[in-house]
Amino acid sequence: MGKTSQRKGADGERELSGLLQQHGFDIQRGGSLSFGTVPDLVGLPGIHIEVKRVERLNVGEAMAQAIRDAEKFHDGAPTLFHRRNRQPWLVTMRLEDWLELYNEK
């Protein structure tokens, strides 16, 4: 992964972390140079947060990474938070996980 890509990823993590903190969530960054040793962000109970801040995203590959990491860290439903330049943040998760979360409410 190139330095520009790493920087953009770290910027995306900081941006999303700040937005979630503004909404009252106690979000902490795992560190952009952790290379999978810790989650991108932590602080949403029952949700594994995978952050992607790219122009061209392969959602299938990104979700596969989120699923692998959620199983590795045992921290919740694999959830992909992603955004392109000048676009709003989007959240992608498996329907079965969303239904489980929604039915708990």
Model regions and ranges:
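Catalytic phosphate/metal-binding cores of nucleic-acid and nucleotide-processing enzymes, i.e., regions
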Residues: 1-105
